[in-house]
């Protein structure tokens, strides 16, 4: 191994790429701010309620006190570089969590000390499971009235179905919370007043916690040492184990997912953050300590992903990286890239292997939220922002042309709400179009289309807040004032039974005419969210060169369903037979025939309208439960379960999105502002007949 490669591998061991994620208001941005303060990135602690945080740098984020985008921040701790991504908690911005977890090696899950595990934490946890991201849990806000570490801890098993192992226990509760018991070193860590939590000291474990700490330490030893036979043997021989060995076992368990280490504190009151940083270094993996990334299966092929080759993180290989975020600002377009293999220098030309074209990297930056530090090269394990890429979007692979690997693709959620967007002046049409193109390039969960009948520009997103933010950005960042239509449900159409349709397209108007005949079977798809095409033509009744035109015609026509003009989804179409004419047939003729065949065939295949069904979770005081449940029933909701925690009740229901517009105002009014709710897309379901008739009549 060359000296330079050895140096690169050594440097790699000192990198941590982590995300901080949680339910909205659990304190993840506050936790990030404390980390930046203690690591010296910022010299003043920003506060969410004051609108001056480092990672929430967009105007809308500071006004609303929520995180909208994933801000990337680099900091140093104990001779290690930590790249942190602070992600949104609001479900409307789940795309940001998805793409961040996709490129990280570890994560801190911030859990609120009063409520415990909440819906968005569950959603994010499942996403992290999908990408096998090692995790540390930080139970936060233990200074709050009603905070209970042990209750919050119990929700980890109950709602996430995991083996959670505390590495700390709290000292004191609510306003008397002063520190933690460190179960690894078996000592108390107590924070001193003033100096924004920068000063703390170690002392003996308080007498009233010694028994509880001994029990928790035993649980930690039993669980962690099971990861290493030699460590377990040493423990049996000596009755204890060296701290370094115990830490190594905890790290092994955290990376494998056998158990999840749990820390605690209160970021807002500056207690518990430094040990959390130590835990990031001690227990979360360096880039080369995780499996790496799978290559993508060939386009259109079904392959068991367990058999796909893995690209390991390797500084000595040919360059390969994944673009996971695009930002347009006053300086141009920034493309955030996670590097998995090799080294790249500014000015190099690389291949976008997803699209098959070359890109030249102009400059590269390490980001500190909206501030940037230029770097001349990046290597395996790095996260950096590239300037100069012309045609690269989220999810594209960038690689050395000598080894044009395509990395595993990202999956993005389906938008469920539409609004129409029209500029207030004709002069602003082009300006608005360019702005919306930039915004949709940044955000793959945002879709843009033109209504074929009205000519209106339609913007589709994940929720009312999502679209509200986009409209606000149009005005602030791009100077476009627009008239916005009321939010509309993004309905879909599908079919419920198979049907075979034959259609002949014949046109003769002097000279050569047009002729094409197709026989197509339409059937419900066995795979959700997919339109599948199969060609079963034999004997050349439809020449091979015209087959793509048939597929193109059906896919184009499927954007306008036969019932109410909504996109048709979840169906399979099979070309069975057809006829052609030596002179009059053409690709265009077969495309036209396929479109007409779709229009006629779908009418006889049991078409139905689908509506988005949302998972709704409402937290309400006991005395309002009856009113809330009754109202949900009136909204066609189906109650899933109810859980009581003290004087509040958590109600889970599935409710059609159509019935949830404006719900927050109604809920506040009905409960005098004491209830709250979260909502996220769950699935599409056929609408009842009376609702379908209403929708069809409105679209006529």
From Swiss-Prot:
Protein encoded by which gene: fusA
InterPro entries: EFG_II, EFG_III, EFG_III/V, EFG_IV, EFG_V, EFG_V-like, EFTu-like_2, G_TR_CS
GO BP annotation list: ribosome disassembly
GO molecular-function terms, A-Z: GTP binding; GTPase activity; guanosine tetraphosphate binding; translation elongation factor activity
Residues given in the record as GTP binding sites: 22-29, 86-90, 140-143
Gene Ontology cellular-component annotations: cytoplasm
Keyword Transport: no
Key words, A-Z: Cytoplasm, Elongation factor, GTP-binding, Nucleotide-binding, Protein biosynthesis
UniProt-annotated location(s): Cytoplasm
Name listed for the protein in its UniProt record: Elongation factor G
Annotated source species: Gluconobacter oxydans (strain 621H)
Pfam families xrefs: EFG_C (PF00679), EFG_III (PF14492), EFG_IV (PF03764), GTP_EFTU (PF00009), GTP_EFTU_D2 (PF03144)
Entry-linked SUPFAM superfamilies: EF-G C-terminal domain-like, P-loop containing nucleoside triphosphate hydrolases, Ribosomal protein S5 domain 2-like, Translation proteins
General function of this protein: Catalyzes the GTP-dependent ribosomal translocation step during translation elongation. During this step, the ribosome changes from the pre-translocational (PRE) to the post-translocational (POST) state as the newly formed A-site-bound peptidyl-tRNA and P-site-bound deacylated tRNA move to the P and E sites, respectively. Catalyzes the coordinated movement of the two tRNA molecules, the mRNA and conformational changes in the ribosome.
Chain ranges of the tr-type G domain: 13-288
Protein family (similarity comment): Belongs to the TRAFAC class translation factor GTPase superfamily. Classic translation factor GTPase family. EF-G/EF-2 subfamily.
PANTHER family for the chain: RIBOSOME-RELEASING FACTOR 2, MITOCHONDRIAL, TRANSLATION ELONGATION FACTOR G-RELATED
Keyword Electron transport: no
């Amino acid at each position: 191994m060359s000296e330079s490669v050895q140096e690169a591998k050594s440097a790699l061991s000192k990198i941590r790429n982590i995300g901080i994620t949680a339910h909205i208001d659990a304190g993840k941005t506050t936790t990030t701010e404390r980390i930046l303060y203690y690591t010296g990135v910022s010299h003043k602690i920003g506060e969410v309620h004051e609108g001056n945080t480092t990672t929430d740098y967009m105007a809308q984020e500071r006004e609303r006190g929520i995180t909208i985008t994933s801000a990337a921040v680099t900091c140093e701790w104990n001779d290690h570089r930590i790249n942190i991504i602070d992600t949104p908690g609001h479900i409307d911005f789940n795309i940001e969590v998805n793409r961040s977890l996709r490129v990280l090696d570890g994560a801190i899950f911030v859990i609120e000390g009063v409520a415990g595990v909440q819906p968005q934490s569950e959603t994010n946890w499942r996403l992290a499971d999908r990408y096998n991201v090692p995790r540390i849990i930080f139970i936060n806000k233990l200074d709050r009235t009603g905070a209970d570490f042990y209750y919050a801890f119990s929700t980890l098993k109950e709602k996430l179905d995991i083996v959670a192992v505390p590495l700390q226990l709290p000292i004191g509760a609510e306003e008397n919370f002063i520190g933690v018991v460190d179960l690894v070193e078996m000592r108390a860590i107590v924070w001193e007043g003033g100096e924004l939590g920068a000063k703390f000291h170690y002392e003996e474990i308080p007498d009233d916690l010694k028994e509880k700490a001994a029990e928790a330490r035993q649980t930690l030893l039993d669980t962690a040492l099971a990861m290493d036979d030699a460590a377990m043997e040493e423990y049996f021989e000596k009755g204890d184990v060296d701290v370094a060995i115990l830490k190594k076992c905890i790290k092994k368990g955290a990376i494998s997912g056998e158990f999840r280490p749990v820390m605690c504190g209160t970021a807002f009151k500056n207690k518990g953050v430094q040990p959390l940083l130590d835990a990031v270094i001690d227990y979360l993996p360096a880039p080369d300590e995780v499996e790496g990334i799978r290559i993508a299966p060939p386009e259109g092929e079904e392959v068991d992903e367990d058999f796909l080759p893995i690209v390991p993180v390797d500084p000595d290989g040919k360059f390969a990286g994944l673009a996971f975020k695009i930002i347009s600002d006053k300086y141009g377009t920034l493309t955030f890239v996670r590097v998995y293999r090799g080294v790249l220098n500014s000015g190099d030309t690389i291949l976008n292997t997803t699209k098959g074209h070359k890109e030249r990297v102009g400059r590269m930056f390490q980001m500190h939220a909206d501030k940037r530090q230029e770097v001349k090269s990046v290597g395996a394990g790095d996260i950096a922002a590239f300037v100069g890429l012309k045609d690269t979007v989220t999810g594209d692979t960038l690689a050395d042309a000598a080894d044009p690997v395509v990395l595993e693709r990202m999956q993005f959620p389906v938008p469920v709400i539409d609004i129409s967007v029209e500029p207030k002046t004709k002069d602003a049409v082009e300006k608005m179009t360019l702005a919306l193109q930039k915004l949709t390039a940044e955000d793959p969960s945002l879709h843009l289309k033109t209504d074929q009948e009205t000519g209106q520009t339609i913007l589709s997103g994940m929720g009312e807040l999502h679209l509200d933010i986009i409209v606000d950005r149009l005005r602030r960042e791009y100077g476009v004032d627009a008239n916005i239509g009321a939010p509309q449900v993004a309905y879909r159409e599908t079919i419920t039974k198979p049907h075979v349709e034959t259609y002949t397209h014949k046109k003769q108007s002097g000279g050569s005419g047009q002729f094409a005949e197709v026989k197509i079977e339409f059937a419900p798809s066995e795979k959700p969210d997919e339109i599948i095409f199969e060609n079963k033509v034999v004997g050349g009744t439809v020449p091979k060169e015209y087959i793509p035109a048939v597929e193109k015609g059906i896919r184009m026509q499927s954007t306008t369903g036969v019932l109410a003009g909504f996109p048709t989804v979840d169906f399979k179409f099979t070309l069975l037979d057809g006829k052609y004419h030596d002179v009059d047939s053409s690709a265009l003729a077969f495309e036209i025939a396929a479109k007409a065949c779709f229009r006629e065939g779908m009418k006889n295949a049991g078409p139905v309208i689908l509506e988005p069904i949302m998972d709704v979770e409402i937290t309400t005081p006991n005395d309002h439960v009856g009113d809330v449940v009754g109202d949900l029933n009136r909204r066609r909701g189906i109650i899933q379960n109810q859980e009581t925690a003290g004087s509040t009740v958590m109600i889970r229901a599935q409710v059609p999105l159509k019935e949830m517009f404006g719900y927050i105002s109604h809920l506040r009014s009905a409960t005098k502002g004491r209830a709250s709710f979260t909502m996220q897309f769950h699935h599409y379901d056929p609408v009842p007949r009376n609702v379908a008739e209403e929708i069809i009549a409105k679209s006529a």
